């Protein structure tokens, strides 16, 4: 009985060594592919290593898995970047989404941020064509995805707000515009100036139309929409008071 137990233990040790050697080969294959910029093959090999070595107690394997977790998001990032350079935006977004998700899963927060920022820039380029063609519905759909990826992309946000206003959804556009206008970081100063101009432009256009129709209740409703988004909106308060005065309802 003892002999059988010893044999079983010996087989277990041999099996563990063989498994480690197999993972070592996978690791070397992944590193070689990564260094040669074959990021698709590298990602596949690194993910295989993670799947097979995740529960290993071997210190070498744990080190390989840790490297793999850092490398997988980078692989997908590079694949997304390459696709973007070729104007293959669908593939670029697909790979960058994988990069961001893998980075979040493995705790690589800086890489997650980088992937989302690049994704937003791609959406910005992607939406530029329909925006310039005044196809605001298509542009808004694209820009909204980019804004979700990186809410700090103020240029993207401004274009999205414009799309909503052009589509007649003034309040939705105003929510975006006010988000930009509330930024106090100096690097967004130019964006804040632009968006305040847009708020005035679209507000004045709506008010002018309603004034031409002597629709004072409509003007008050516009002001109320603005105040619902930002209760401290001085422009909205002024518009409302003026409309009440013109209506002689005070």
Question: Language-model segments: which ranges?
Answer:
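TPR alpha-solenoid repeat register
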Residues: 59, 68, 75, 108-109, ...
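TPR-repeat structural position
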Residues: 39-40, 89, 136-137, 170, ...
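Register position in tetratricopeptide repeats
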Residues: 35-36, 74, 78, 85, ...
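Canonical positions in the second alpha-helix
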Residues: 49, 99, 146, 180, ...
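Canonical tetratricopeptide repeat
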Residues: 62-64, 71, 78, 118, ...
């Amino acid at each position: 009985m003892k002999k059988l137990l010893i044999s079983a233990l010996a087989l277990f040790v041999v099996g563990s060594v063989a498994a480690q050697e197999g993972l070592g080969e996978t690791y070397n294959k992944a590193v070689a592919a990564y260094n040669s910029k074959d990021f698709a093959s590298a990602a596949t090999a690194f993910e295989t290593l993670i799947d097979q070595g995740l529960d290993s107690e071997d210190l070498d394997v744990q080190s390989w898995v840790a490297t793999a977790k850092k490398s997988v998001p980078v692989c997908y990032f590079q694949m997304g970047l390459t696709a973007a350079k070729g104007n293959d935006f669908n593939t670029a977004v697909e790979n960058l989404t994988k990069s961001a998700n893998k980075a979040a899963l493995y705790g690589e927060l800086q890489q997650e941020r980088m992937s989302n920022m690049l994704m937003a820039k791609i959406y910005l380029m992607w939406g530029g064509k329909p925006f310039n063609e005044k196809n605001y519905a298509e542009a808004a759909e694209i820009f909204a995805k980019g804004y979700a990826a990186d809410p700090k992309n103020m240029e993207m946000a401004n274009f999205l707000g414009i799309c909503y206003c052009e589509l007649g959804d003034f309040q939705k556009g105003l929510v975006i515009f006010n988000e930009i206008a509330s930024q106090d970081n100096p690097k967004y100063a130019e964006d804040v100036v632009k968006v305040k101009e847009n708020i005035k432009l679209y507000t004045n256009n709506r008010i002018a139309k309603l004034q031409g129709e002597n629709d004072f209740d409509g003007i008050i409703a516009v002001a109320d929409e603005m105040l619902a988004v930002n209760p401290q909106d001085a422009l909205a308060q002024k518009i409302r008071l003026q409309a009440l005065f013109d209506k002689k309802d005070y």
